């Protein structure tokens, strides 16, 4: 079986972890990891918001799936657009890793204690708009590159800190580099942050059945709510967007955020309901955000206004 993935250190680590679990479950299975270069890997010097963001890191991998070049794709769920190409499916959703963002800084242990004017790097509009709301006195620096490249900027003193996803840091075994795990109450994660997606062709039902041992039902419900939220806002929405769903017992709570491209406006909402209503809850949260000012932000986006 051929498994398609990006070639970054994090993507390969994630894919090897999945491959190891598959090999443990099916010792006789022959596995081959196929590295596929994506548009996001090629266009490294352009801010993600300017080149479309969603889908940039998976398009070529999905094309390989559809062409039969690979049988299974391993993605970060947060890179997946709200709508999948016809003929593809999310075959399995493993248990979620830490969904939080983290601060890695050479000058301070906590975000609240950073000095005014500190230079903090991030490659995400979602993070930028929330950071500016939290600490408008900081200088937020746009940042591209792989995880190790971003962290190196701090070590080289080019930046006072970077904010990145905890999941990638943990999967790489770099948790000791973290100076603060930022609570989701302060910074909402991206849709699907911390979750891996195992994508296959819809026709490969036997393969989907074989991946069932990797499925985590709670994570699937949480991600289903988050992706319903994203879908209602518009799958290709380039506004800063965040959503995080948490299941506790039979209750599913989902919090969401939408911001403006100029990073000066941020709207947040929260709702909860039955775990059986994941899609409805995500959709309803998006509706509330749209009614609370998000629709105006989308209209400004269509008109070319910041």
UniProtKB/Swiss-Prot annotation:
GO biological process: protoporphyrinogen IX biosynthetic process
Ranges in coiled-coil conformation: none
Pfam families: Porphobil_deam, Porphobil_deamC
Note on how the cofactor is bound: Binds 1 dipyrromethane group covalently.
InterPro entries registered for this protein in UniProt: HemC (IPR000860), Porphobilin_deaminase_N (IPR022417), Porphobilinogen_deaminase_C (IPR022418), Porphobilinogen_deaminase_C_sf (IPR036803)
EC number: 2.5.1.61
Enzyme class: transferase
Cofactors (names): dipyrromethane
Catalyzed chemical reaction(s): 4 porphobilinogen + H2O = hydroxymethylbilane + 4 NH4(+)
Modified residues annotated as S-(dipyrrolylmethanemethyl)cysteine in this record: 237
Gene Ontology MF term list: hydroxymethylbilane synthase activity
UniProt pathway: Porphyrin-containing compound metabolism; protoporphyrin-IX biosynthesis; coproporphyrinogen-III from 5-aminolevulinate: step 2/4
Keywords of the record: Porphyrin biosynthesis, Transferase
GO cellular component terms attached to this protein's record: cytoplasm
Function: Tetrapolymerization of the monopyrrole PBG into the hydroxymethylbilane pre-uroporphyrinogen in several discrete steps.
Quaternary structure (record): Monomer.
Family the entry assigns: Belongs to the HMBS family.
Additional note from the record: The porphobilinogen subunits are added to the dipyrromethane group.
Protein name: Porphobilinogen deaminase
Lineage: Bacteria, Pseudomonadati, Thermodesulfobacteriota, Syntrophia, Syntrophales
């Amino acid at each position: 079986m051929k498994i398609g993935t990006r070639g970054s250190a994090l993507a390969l680590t994630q894919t090897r972890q999945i491959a190891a679990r598959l090999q443990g479950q099916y010792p006789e299975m022959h596995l081959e990891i196929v590295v596929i270069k994506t548009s996001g890997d090629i266009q490294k010097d352009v801010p993600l918001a300017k080149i479309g963001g969603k889908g940039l890191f998976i398009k070529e991998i999905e094309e390989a799936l559809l062409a039969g070049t690979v049988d299974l794709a391993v993605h970060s769920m947060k890179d997946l657009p709200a709508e999948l190409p016809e003929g593809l499916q999310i075959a399995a959703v493993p248990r979620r890793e830490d969904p939080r963002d983290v601060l890695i800084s050479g000058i301070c242990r906590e975000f609240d204690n950073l000095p005014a004017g500190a230079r903090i790097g991030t490659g995400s509009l979602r993070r930028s708009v929330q950071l500016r709301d939290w600490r408008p006195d900081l200088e937020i620096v746009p940042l591209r590159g792989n995880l190790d490249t971003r962290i190196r900027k701090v070590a080289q003193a080019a930046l006072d800190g970077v904010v990145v996803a905890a999941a990638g840091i943990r999967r790489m075994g770099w948790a000791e580099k973290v100076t603060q795990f930022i609570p989701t109450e302060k910074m909402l994660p991206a849709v699907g942050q911390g979750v891996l997606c195992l994508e296959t062709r819809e026709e490969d039902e036997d393969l989907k059945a074989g991946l069932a041992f990797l499925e985590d039902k709670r994570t699937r419900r949480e991600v289903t709510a988050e992706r319903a939220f994203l879908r209602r806002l518009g799958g290709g929405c380039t506004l800063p967007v965040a959503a995080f769903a948490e299941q506790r017992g039979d209750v599913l709570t989902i919090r969401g955020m939408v911001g403006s491209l100029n990073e000066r406006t941020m709207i947040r909402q929260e709702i909860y309901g039955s775990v059986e209503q994941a899609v409805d809850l995500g959709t309803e949260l998006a509706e509330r955000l749209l009614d609370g000012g998000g629709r105006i932000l989308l209209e400004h986006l269509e008109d070319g206004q910041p």
